[in-house]
């Protein structure tokens, strides 16, 4: 792949349209819930604020699928569908932060920590941590409900078969991300990790959810045929795993000022990632025991990072990413020129990023 390019003006306009679509949707929701009082209104505003910003990669893949199938510019129905996928992403992130007990997200307090702090600041009675955790569960559910509502409305505005197909893919995506997240939870209960097991988590938690389904949903909404959806899938599964491997690297070696999360957070949380699995394959018995003992501890982050670096796992993962990029590039070559034009720069954004 060529060097990464800046986001195009058309893409920037599209990303701004996503924010506007979410704002419109939330504003339309509020009048029905304002009678419930300021607490609920504040909860809704906090949910909307949580999905502001971010990489918007999933929305961009919806756009790429749409453009690859239709060649049309950012139609409102596509923008609303992409916004729905971003709301789904918001739901997953709120719950993910809660399960990982993460303190921050994008440089701000995670939802459960935010509302834990609000509980204390307001002088409420009861357990502040319980309040924060409970609110995070509910906010994730709320964002999922909003996502469902928005995509069903968008699908009703296109040809019936196309709309039904897009919603079916969306429903499958929700089940796949739940399955991938559960596999991730199970992995953290095991004393060891294999690269194959970690790759399975990467495929379901990231490749399908981040790249494959958004691409296919956008293409299906525009009336794309089976051949196009299959071609997009071939691109996505290579590209999506590369995206997750880059995430693994950033979770250990990323700059907190850029990622918005503390350095080594994946190690602190005991994540059984492909990077960790690769390191365990490469080190000797004593280093292996040391790395496994360090995972999931605050004090062991620096030692675990040093062991991973010394093992050669970082170089091995970078080589894996390069191989996956090449395979994705070859799959893009098999698409028509219209699809190639929108996918190539987006593929670079997914794998050559610092956050």
Mark where each language-model region is.
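Acidic, Mg2+-coordinating active-site segments of isoprenoid diphosphate-utilizing enzymes
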Residues: 67-69, 94-124, 148, 177-195, ...
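A short glycine-threonine-serine/GTX helix/turn-capping micro-motif
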Residues: 132-138, 196-206
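Short hairpin/turn module used for nucleic-acid contact or packing/dimerization
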Residues: 303-355
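Transmembrane helix-loop-helix
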Residues: 151-168, 291
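Residue-level signal for inorganic ion chemistry
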Residues: 61, 147, 180, 276, ...
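Alpha-helical scaffolds flanking conserved acidic
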Residues: 72-88, 133, 163-169, 228-239, ...
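A glycine/threonine-rich phosphate-anchoring loop and its flanking beta-alpha core
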Residues: 123, 127-156
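Conserved N-terminal diphosphate/IPP-binding helix and adjacent helical/loop segment
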Residues: 1-85, 90, 94-95, 99-129, ...
